[in-house]
Curated annotation (Swiss-Prot):
Induction: The 3' end of scpA overlaps with the 5' end of scpB, indicating the genes are cotranscribed. InterPro entries: ScpA, ScpA-like_C. Belongs to the ScpA family. It comes from Myxococcus xanthus (strain DK1622). This is Segregation and condensation protein A.
């Protein structure tokens, strides 16, 4: 079969047009198939044949023609297309062989062998085509749905609690007070535990100042954070009293507070020999109660 590949582009270029290269004279547009099964479905629909009664001679011929067109335009043919071509040729040859009669076969294993031999060779191909068509239809249906983040966008709102219908409430016919009374009876049967409350001694401002002085004298400096270590587990009241003691010592110019950089560690340094002259009775706690 010969084709006339001449087109209007073979004519001489008109005035003002650039000459065309030989590769631009002949162009073929082929549909893009996902695989050999997709191509077979296309051929079956194009020639309007029954998928359950595939004319292998016609379909094989059209399939090979399509592969030949792909070669003509220098397309790389995937191996799966060539495997399907050989499969179609094999099925076509099997269809030409005479079928054996199951009734004339012997009983036992020979019957099963003959039954398999007399089965329609196209059955497996039809099954694969139907299964592929099912997944293809599902993919096309999913492709029509809106895509989150592209077509639709979710609102970032807190999920509200779903109200429970009244008929699903478990305590509908039971008093909650009775449940509380039952809990009280269980607690009464438990062995009572001895409870005692530990009360910390109240720290005065003078005592807090002396504690800071004791931390400063050995090393000549102390970190502010080290006055509140987790090992000593200071109470909220002790933390406040210690902070007031530091303010009082700065006010009386007993210590200096130094920070070399923003958000850096805070150092407490003695102001000369002022700490050596400090007497415990010089601070009155009445101003900070």
């Amino acid at each position: 079969m010969s084709e006339d590949r001449r087109s209007p582009t073979d004519e001489a270029p008109r005035e003002g047009e650039l000459p065309r290269s030989p590769g631009d004279n002949f162009r073929i547009a082929l549909p893009n198939f996902e695989g050999p099964l997709d191509l077979l479905l296309h051929l079956i629909k194009e020639h309007r044949v029954d998928i359950f009664d595939i004319p292998l001679a016609l379909i094989t011929e059209k399939y090979l023609e399509h592969l030949e067109r792909m070669r003509e335009i220098n397309l790389d043919i995937a191996g799966e297309f060539l495997v399907m071509a050989s499969t179609l040729a094999h099925l076509k040859s099997r269809m030409l062989l005479p079928r054996q009669d199951v009734a004339s076969a012997q009983e036992g294993a020979e019957v099963l062998a003959v039954a398999e031999e007399t089965e329609d060779p196209r059955a497996e191909l039809v099954r694969r085509l139907l299964e592929y068509q099912k997944y293809k239809d599902a993919a096309e249906q999913l492709a029509t749905q809106d895509l989150l983040g592209r077509d639709v966008f979710a609102r970032n709102v807190p999920v509200e609690a779903v109200p429970i219908p009244e008929e699903e409430v478990g305590l509908q016919e039971f008093s909650v007070l009775k449940l509380v009374e039952a809990l009280d009876r269980v607690l009464e049967r438990l062995q009572p535990k001895l409870q005692h409350e530990v009360v910390r001694e109240r720290v005065t401002l003078s005592e807090a100042i002396l504690r800071v002085v004791e931390r400063l004298r050995p090393h000549g400096q102390v970190l502010f954070e080290s006055l509140f270590t987790e090992e000593e587990t200071p109470s909220r009241q002790e933390v406040v009293i210690t902070f007031l003691a530091i303010l009082e010592m700065v006010k009386r110019r007993l210590i200096r507070v130094v920070q070399d950089e923003p958000l850096g560690p805070i150092l407490l340094l003695p102001n000369g020999d002022a700490l050596e002259k400090l007497a415990p009775t010089e601070v009155d706690d009445s101003d900070y109660r």
